[in-house]
Every structure is written in structure tokens, then in C-alpha cells.
């Protein structure tokens, strides 16, 4: 009987946590609808608000998802299932935003976004990432589950379990793979593309999560590990900001310069 009560309590906490994340998604969605209606003739302000709300939603849900996954050590597939599901949710609800400075950088380098618009989106992501800490802190202070009470302090939990060069390689490689897929899946049907990207993100988290957390998103990393940035800024700056940016740069160089050059050389050699 005691075991059943403990299991029931665990299920209640899990359902409450899932409900909290879905509520954040719903409220952010309603705010986006209002923003679209009110700011149709101000593209900069419109882009800022949408990017802010998208980053806020992503960071808040990831805070709660990380907390929930830490409480289920006996179910190794449970966190991955949640990651896949909420990646689908974000993919369906955050259309037109990136919630990732690396995504903005990629669009600017490929000529798909002006520097001014890029700066506005980056600022929105920064504010959204920092604002999510206050938002999720206020929600946790309500003590809706037993997990929230013990996690409200946002103490630094260093996710880097390898030395610095390996951590840089992991984050750069994750960023390279994800954004390469993002770039090359443009022609895939939207419904299928969302599932493919969700599966890819889940795989990357599974492969690199135990090494660095496999964040490959500077804004999300700042929100999740703000205290760690304060205590070991240089290490976290290199791993979570520079490394994903390096992955983007390598991806651009490969697909925009190296592969076309290789193809042209091959074509010339065949003609000769």
C-alpha cells in the first residue's frame, strides 16, 4: 500500500509538471496571437516579440523538462520521450522563429536576414533567456510539486563531464549536424521535417547529453547554466557560445564553399 501511494504521488507530480509545461506553451501561443494582431505594420517590433516569446517558451519548458528528467533515473527512455514530444510541440508552435542565436547567425551569413533584424532577434533571445529564469523561478516558488521546492535556488550544476577540448568538439559537432539538417531539410514536407528534426535532436541529446548536456544553443545554455557562467565564465563561454558558433561557421564553409568547389573541380576533370 505504501508503495502504491508513493507511485501515485510520483505520477501526480509528473502530470503536474507536464501540465505546467503545456500551460507555458499555451500562454505563449496566446501572447503570439495578440502580438500578431497588434504589430502587423511594425516588422522589427513584431519580430522582437515573437522571438522573445519563443525563447521564453523554449527555456521555461527545458528548465522544467531537465528537472523532471532528473527525477526519473529508473526510466532511461522517459527523458528522451519527453524531449522528442516537446521538440515536436516547439516545432509546431514556434514557426518563423529560431530561439537560437546560431540559427540567426546562419541566416545572416547566408544572406537571408539583414544585420539589423538579426541584432533585434539576438537581443530578444537574450532577454527571453534571462527572463525565463525569473518566470520559472516564480512558478517553482508555488511549490506545485515536491521537486520544485528543492530546485528553486538555480544552483550551478556543471554539466561538462569531459575536458575542455572534447566539450568544444561535442557542442560544435552537435551544432554542425543540427543546422546542416535544418538547412538541407527545407524541401522536405513540413510535417515530416518536424519529426525528422525532433528525432535528430533526441539522438544528439542521447549521444552528447552525458558529456556536455548537448545544448548547442547559446541562449538556452545561458538560461540553464547562468550561475555556472558567473562562476566559470571563460569555460562556459567557450563551450556553449563559441563552440556552437564554430559549428555554424564550419557548416557554412562546407555547404557554401567547399562542396561547390569540389563539385566544380570534379565536373571540370570529367570534361577534360
Curated annotation (Swiss-Prot):
One of its GO terms (molecular function) is hydrogen peroxide channel activity. One of its GO terms (cellular component) is cytoplasm. It comes from the Eukaryota. Its main location: endoplasmic reticulum. Keywords: Cell membrane, Cytoplasmic vesicle, Disulfide bond, Endoplasmic reticulum, Membrane, Transmembrane, Transmembrane helix, Transport. InterPro entries: AQP11/12_channel (IPR051883), Aquaporin-like (IPR023271), Aquaporin_11 (IPR023266), Aquaporin_11/12 (IPR016697), MIP (IPR000425). Expressed in retina specifically at retinal Mueller glial cells. Coiled coil: none annotated. It is found in: Endoplasmic reticulum membrane; Cytoplasmic vesicle membrane; Cell membrane. The chain crosses the membrane at residues 15-35, 48-68, 76-96, 168-188, 196-216, 236-256. A motif (NPC) lies at residues 100-102. GO terms for biological process: endosomal lumen acidification; hydrogen peroxide transmembrane transport; intracellular oxygen homeostasis; intracellular water homeostasis; negative regulation of epithelial cell proliferation; negative regulation of ERAD pathway; positive regulation of cell population proliferation; protein glycosylation. Pfam families: MIP. Residues 1-14, 69-75, 189-195, 257-272 are cytoplasmic. Residues 36-47, 97-167, 217-235 are lumenal. It is a multi-pass membrane protein. Not glycosylated. It catalyses: H2O(in) = H2O(out); glycerol(in) = glycerol(out); H2O2(out) = H2O2(in). The keyword Protein biosynthesis does not apply. A motif (NPA) lies at residues 217-219. The NPC motif is essential for oligomerization and water permeability function. Channel protein that facilitates the transport of water, glycerol and hydrogen peroxide across membrane of cell or organelles guaranteeing intracellular homeostasis in several organes like liver, kidney and brain. In situation of stress, participates in endoplasmic reticulum (ER) homeostasis by regulating redox homeostasis through the transport of hydrogen peroxide across the endoplasmic reticulum membrane thereby regulating the oxidative stress through the NADPH oxidase 2 pathway. Belongs to the MIP/aquaporin (TC 1.A.8) family. AQP11/AQP12 subfamily. Homodimer; disulfide-linked. Homotetramer. Can also form homomultimer. This is Aquaporin-11. It comes from Equus caballus.
Amino acid at each position: 500500500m505504501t508503495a502504491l501511494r508513493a507511485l501515485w504521488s510520483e505520477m501526480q507530480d509528473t502530470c503536474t509538471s507536464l501540465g505546467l509545461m503545456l500551460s507555458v506553451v499555451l500562454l505563449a501561443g496566446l501572447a503570439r496571437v495578440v502580438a500578431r494582431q497588434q504589430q502587423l505594420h511594425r516588422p522589427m517590433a513584431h519580430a522582437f516579440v515573437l522571438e522573445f516569446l519563443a525563447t521564453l517558451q523554449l527555456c521555461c519548458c527545458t528548465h522544467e523538462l531537465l528537472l523532471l528528467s532528473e527525477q526519473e533515473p529508473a526510466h532511461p527512455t522517459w527523458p528522451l520521450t519527453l524531449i522528442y514530444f516537446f521538440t515536436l510541440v516547439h516545432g509546431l508552435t514556434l514557426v518563423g522563429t529560431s530561439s537560437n542565436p546560431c540559427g540567426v547567425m546562419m541566416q545572416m551569413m547566408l544572406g537571408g536576414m539583414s544585420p539589423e533584424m538579426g541584432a533585434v532577434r539576438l537581443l530578444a533571445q537574450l532577454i527571453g533567456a534571462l527572463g525565463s529564469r525569473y518566470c520559472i523561478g516564480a512558478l517553482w516558488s508555488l511549490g506545485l510539486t515536491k521537486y520544485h521546492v528543492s530546485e528553486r535556488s538555480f544552483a550551478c550544476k556543471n554539466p561538462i563531464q569531459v575536458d575542455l577540448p572534447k566539450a568544444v568538439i561535442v557542442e560544435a559537432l552537435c551544432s554542425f549536424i543540427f543546422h546542416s539538417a535544418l538547412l538541407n531539410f527545407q524541401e522536405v514536407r513540413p510535417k515530416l521535417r518536424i519529426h525528422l528534426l525532433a528525432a535528430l535532436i533526441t539522438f544528439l541529446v542521447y549521444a552528447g547529453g552525458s558529456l556536455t548536456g548537448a545544448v548547442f544553443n547559446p541562449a538556452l545554455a545561458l538560461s540553464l547554466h547562468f550561475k555556472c557562467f558567473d562562476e566559470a565564465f571563460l569555460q562556459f563561454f567557450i563551450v556553449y557560445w563559441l563552440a556552437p558558433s564554430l559549428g555554424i561557421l564550419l557548416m557554412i564553409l562546407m555547404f557554401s564553399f567547399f562542396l561547390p568547389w569540389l563539385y566544380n573541380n570534379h565536373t571540370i576533370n570529367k570534361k577534360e
